[in-house]
């Protein structure tokens, strides 16, 4: 694993639990927030590419990656708690500069909820197949997720058989399917029943209607997104993602019409794996074109890549 993940491991004791994070390089902070059933491994290539010029901070959510895997008696596994954890980590690391926020999957909800608490701390946004709002118009909640979220058989498949992580690793890349070694690395933190409770709780915590835990918080985040309309933003999107599909991309574009958009027609959910050789240079160029010492201006709008 060390050849694929060549980083120093750091831990913060948070409410009695070990919270793992990467803290690489120096310079303007870039904070990368992963989703489910992923972990900081997803950002490894981007972290390596940026750490010579930036301070790269990448946490593993509690219950994920190399962080501790508690039971329900020791952790709430709630959306709000995830935001509180990220808040505590950045406070612990004394991050006082404005940050670049990179988000994927659940990381969009968590990261943008943090941003909503401290809008003045956010300098640039990198959006990767994610959301920070309720289901967009025209999008139905996928049946496979509904089964995992709401049924006993779904609980069995996700928790007992690890099918959520296993299938995500198999279908998350379309252009460049993951090798066996990569699939193994993505699933390694969740190799026992006790280690994969977070993958189940994340799915069960998806708020779909008023009264669901976290629904009001997502509503607050959604309602405050216009505060970030003038920030530099780049969006890299795998169009073959069956969850975060064209409807979600269209909603990002509606809310942020000045964002750069790079759509990849042949790529899936794990866009940093599927099109790493294109997406990482795009992000590097975006950061170079929008330095933090320059006045904040709207990003030039761009159409999806012609070759996507």
Q: What is each PLM-predicted segment?
A:
Residues 195-254:
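Conserved serine/cysteine hydrolase catalytic core
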Residues 137-201:
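Helix-rich cap/lid subdomain of alpha/beta-hydrolase
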Residues 97-139:
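Conserved hydrolase catalytic core segment
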Residues 22-69:
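Conserved HGGG/HGGXW glycine-rich cap/lid loop of the alpha/beta-hydrolase fold
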Residues 2-18:
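N-terminal cap/lid segment of alpha/beta-hydrolase-fold proteins
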Residues 33-35, 104, 237:
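The conserved beta1-alpha1 loop
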Residues 14-15, 22, 58-103, 281:
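Active-site loop/oxyanion-hole signature of alpha/beta-hydrolase fold enzymes
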